[in-house]
Amino acid sequence: MDPEMRAGTLLLAALLSAILLALAACSRNDDTAVPPPRSSITFLHYFTDSLSGGIDEMSQGFNNQHPALELKAISLDHEAFKTSIQDTLKTDNPPELYSYWAGARTASIVDELEPLDELWQQAGWDKAFAPSVIKAASEYRGKKYFLPLTQHYIAFFYNKKLFDQLQLQPPKTWEEFLAVCAALKARGITPIALGARDKWPAQFWFDYLLLRTAPYSFRQQLMSGEARFDDPQVRAVFARWKSLIDKGYFNSRPHPNELAWDSGANDMVFRGEAAMTLMGTWNLAYFSNNTHQWQAGKDFDFFPFPQIDPAIPTVALGPIDGIVMPKRAHDKAGAGTALRYLASAEAQRTFSRYSGALAPNLQVPDSAYSDIQRRVRKELERSPVFDFAFDLATPPPVAELGLDAFAEFLAFPDAYPEITRRLADEAAARFSATRAVKPAP
């Protein structure tokens, strides 16, 4: 080969190599190209600390299925959340979604929410949720605003090994309950742990003592301001509650107002210092977490609040958590996509698994639940009525008065006649003020 031909061949080879390298580089650039940014859907919620089970897993499930969207779940503790939602709802750039409590809490902010009726119909959610749940939790002023996410049940959670050791059976009547408490006290064990540092846990005692002794219609009247908190039926509740305190059936050191519901009261039950606590089914996740590793049905179990008056039909108590969309949300389409996923059986099954809650979605089968969750579901089915706890059943300004009154009562049980009189007067004024603010059409 002459020198010129050889030089040409080498040049051609060099050019081909350069082209191949360039193509390879382009290929590598294509492979490593930064994907377009995902649109963020902000979801502000209150599922924190001991109540956080399932929220991250559920959010991740959405993000895995929607590469163009990112559900950003941002948590605040309960009290901070109550303030934050009021402050941010009316701004020009609120989060796309909020968690919230069904009942009076949602009713109090409905003017700031986006109706979900069109999305509801498109998604066929009337088939996904029970009519009773839709009516109680989702509908306000004839429109749907609230997507149900969890349903919890308030019951006694007890140290089963301790009960078995002392040959005690879960009580079904008030007389049996008092006998169990007396037996525990005689053995030096605190019968009932109450951690009311955050105020709201004490309300369950007021609620159930009222619902087991007074007609359900009276409770509805009380929650709506048609009955007063110094009514004899209410005072009888405080008198019965006081008798339990006087007998030493609650923890006194630390005092309930100084004790957390989880690391305080629950852990007293876990350690065997107390036998039981009145709390929600989020305790299923708490007692079985990595720290405690209790097995439901073996180490701990639950029983319903005992019957007091056989003439009073059973009412089950608990919250329904869900999701609302503010009417000022910027990305309503993206928020709607997120709501479709969060309403699905897949998402609600995930949340139920980690939180201990029952899934409102009817398409979640019984096989998805643990044995204790299935038994909880049966208790709910046996109750003619399911209602929300005190602070979710009455307007927020009245609820705050009540929670303060319960805390004051725990500190000064003998003062309940004065506490109920003052609560009655202050609640009447709050109800009047609430009625004076006419809802927007």
What is each stretch, according to the model?
Residues L23-T106, V110, Q121-K127, P170, ...:
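Conserved N-terminal structural module of periplasmic/extracytoplasmic solute-binding proteins
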Residues E118-P131, T213-A236, N290-Q295, Q307-T314:
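Short, solvent-exposed loop/beta-turn-alpha elements that line the ligand-binding surface or hinge
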